[in-house]
Amino acid sequence: MGEQSFVVHVWGQVQGVGFRYFTRERALQLGLRGYAYNLADGSVEILICGPEQGVQMMLGWLEHGPRTAEVTRMEYEEAPPPQKGGFHTN
């Protein structure tokens, strides 16, 4: 299995509920790198990169997010891998 990299956008009740924090924790558990940033329109943009199995598990988790969030829509597409290591939030 190779590496995969996706940029993901999630909408719903995803800001002010710990979404980025829990996303970072889950990504690090899965050995992924990337970021989770709040956007001005109330959505969250996430870049995830790493082993295919971990990325696929993360995509499944992001469909629902943490218990504190309510994801109403999710879109993703392949993207270049991040320039930096680790997993960052704004």
Curated annotation (Swiss-Prot):
**Pfam families xrefs:** Acylphosphatase
Write down the chemical reaction(s) this protein catalyses: an acyl phosphate + H2O = a carboxylate + phosphate + H(+)
Active site (catalytic residues): R20, N38
Provide the top EC class.
hydrolase
- Position of the signal peptide: none
Every copy of the Acylphosphatase-like domain together lies at 5-90
**Hydrolase as UniProt keyword:** yes
Family of this protein: Belongs to the acylphosphatase family.
The protein in question is named Acylphosphatase
- Which organism is this protein's natural source? Aeromonas salmonicida (strain A449)
